[in-house]
């Protein structure tokens, strides 16, 4: 039997397969990241731009526009158990401790830019507080089980100083390895950590998966990449033309050679001739002045119109309003409703993505609950755990208030409903505080009413004691209808 410091044969086979798969996918992932970060340098075709000017780089941030506006709309709110209207306290504590919203934002950014993101749920120093972290797809390779829609094995490789570390996660065990970075050296097994989970505690967030490509696809599509390349080359042509043709060219006809000679007999430079000599040319011996012709300077709109054409194509591909690309200042919406209509398709995409990512986040919550309760089953109702997202549409407080007020007036919804406060844009913490304030305010109102009743007790006839001066002879007052 092999010692625990040596990889078993089946473990080594899995490790080598995943390591090869990661290396094979790394180039495509790095290219997608370069488009997202605006670091991709477009290849010069060397048709109109000489090789000596290839050092001029033109960069467009349109790749980032395929990612960031969509991540901004994916705002996680809370987990709720089936039948409950409030967030679960246990899961809320775990998520707050781990900064889950920040980790989820990074995983979603990876999913949109690289096609997939990963969230790992592990253990830390506190056995009842799981660790939830986002892992980069460029460091991760996965063997996926299509039937169970879950990973069989997951390998994560990362650098630590001069050495390279690797973590191989398998059902019931986690293997930690290291490599000294020397060519030809072997991977060393540092630790073998058994656990009680019969699954790999890694969740994949795949953007726009297909039945034949479940690993997801980048939101920076091939069509968008072609548009970015064409627009970048056009901008490069604009840069070169600005340097060569922005100064109007001039032609001098009938000038004498002496017009280009300095008083000391040396020749004037081309720059001196352009700036000075042509302004003070003398007549020749026949009294004729040299004829100066100025060529028409280049028009930059030749290039900017092409860039605008590419921008219009990118706008359609991205489902973004044209002004998002910084080209159409006249494209600003005239009203809030107009802005909502312009971004409607992007909002519908966000709704679809929420439906896609909800089962994945439910798996994250299940893993967190299992690790926080070692040896125990999931709580009742956890299988139907709900994931609450904030609405992706642009929020208009005035419009929302008007709509809710009309619904409350029609008694379609109760005014103190938590749903009403959520539609008005209040966060869970704010809604809880408002509920506490409402209870305190109602208590104050009841106390104030009780104090008023104590100070002014009502008699059986409906008047205050000692205050009914018209109660009749028995009350010491005047009878009804009597004169004063």
Where are these regions (language model features)?
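Intrinsically disordered or highly flexible coil/loop and linker segments, enriched in small
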Residues: 117, 233, 237-248, 316-327, ...
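Surface-exposed loop-to-helix/strand elements on domain peripheries
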Residues: 80-84, 282-400, 436-438
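Extended, helix-rich architectural segments
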Residues: 1-134, 139, 450, 461-465, ...
């Amino acid at each position: 039997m092999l010692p625990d410091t040596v990889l078993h044969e089946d473990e080594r086979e899995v490790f080598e397969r995943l390591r090869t798969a990661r290396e094979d996918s790394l180039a495509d992932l790095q290219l997608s990241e370069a488009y997202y970060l605006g670091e991709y340098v477009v290849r010069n075709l060397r048709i109109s731009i000489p090789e000596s000017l290839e050092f001029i780089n033109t960069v467009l941030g349109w790749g980032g526009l395929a990612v960031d506006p969509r991540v901004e709309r994916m705002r996680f709110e809370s987990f709720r158990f089936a039948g409950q209207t409030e967030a679960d306290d246990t899961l809320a504590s775990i998520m707050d401790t781990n900064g889950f919203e920040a980790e989820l934002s990074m995983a979603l950014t990876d999913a949109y830019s690289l096609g997939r993101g990963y969230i790992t749920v592990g253990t830390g120093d506190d056995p009842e507080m799981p660790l939830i972290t986002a892992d980069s797809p460029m460091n991760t390779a996965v063997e996926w089980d299509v039937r169970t829609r879950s990973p069989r094995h997951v390998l994560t490789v990362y650098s630590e100083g001069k050495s390279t570390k690797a973590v191989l996660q398998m059902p019931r065990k986690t293997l930690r390895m290291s490599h000294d970075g020397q060519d030809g050296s072997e991977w060393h097994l540092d630790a073998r950590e058994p656990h009680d989970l019969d699954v790999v505690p890694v969740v994949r967030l795949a953007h726009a998966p297909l039945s034949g490509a479940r690993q997801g696809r980048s939101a920076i599509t091939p069509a968008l990449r072609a548009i970015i390349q064409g627009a970048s080359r056009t901008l490069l042509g604009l840069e070169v033309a600005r340097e060569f043709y922005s100064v109007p060219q001039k032609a001098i006809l009938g000038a004498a050679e002496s017009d280009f000679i300095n008083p000391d007999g040396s020749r004037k430079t081309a720059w001196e001739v352009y700036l000075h000599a042509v302004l003070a040319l003398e007549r020749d011996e026949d009294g004729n002045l040299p004829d100066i012709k100025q060529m028409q300077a280049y028009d930059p709109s030749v290039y900017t119109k092409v860039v605008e054409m590419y921008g219009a194509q990118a706008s359609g591909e991205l489902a973004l309003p044209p002004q998002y690309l910084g080209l159409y200042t006249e494209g600003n919406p005239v009203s809030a409703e107009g802005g909502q209509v312009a971004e409607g398709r992007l909002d519908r995409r966000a709704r679809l993505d929420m439906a896609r990512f909800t089962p994945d986040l439910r798996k994250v919550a299940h893993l967190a609950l299992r690790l926080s309760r070692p040896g125990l089953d999931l709580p009742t109702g956890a299988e139907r755990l709900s994931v609450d997202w904030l609405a992706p549409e642009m929020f208009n407080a005035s419009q929302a208030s008007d709509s809710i007020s009309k619904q409350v007036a029609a008694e379609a919804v109760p005014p103190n409903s938590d749903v009403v406060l959520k539609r008005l844009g209040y966060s869970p913490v704010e809604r809880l505080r408002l509920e506490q304030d409402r209870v305190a305010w109602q208590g104050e109102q009841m106390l104030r009413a009780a104090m008023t009743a104590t100070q002014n007790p009502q008699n059986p006839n409906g008047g205050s004691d000692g205050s009914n001066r018209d109660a009749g002879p028995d009350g010491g007052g005047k009878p009804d209808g009597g004169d004063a």
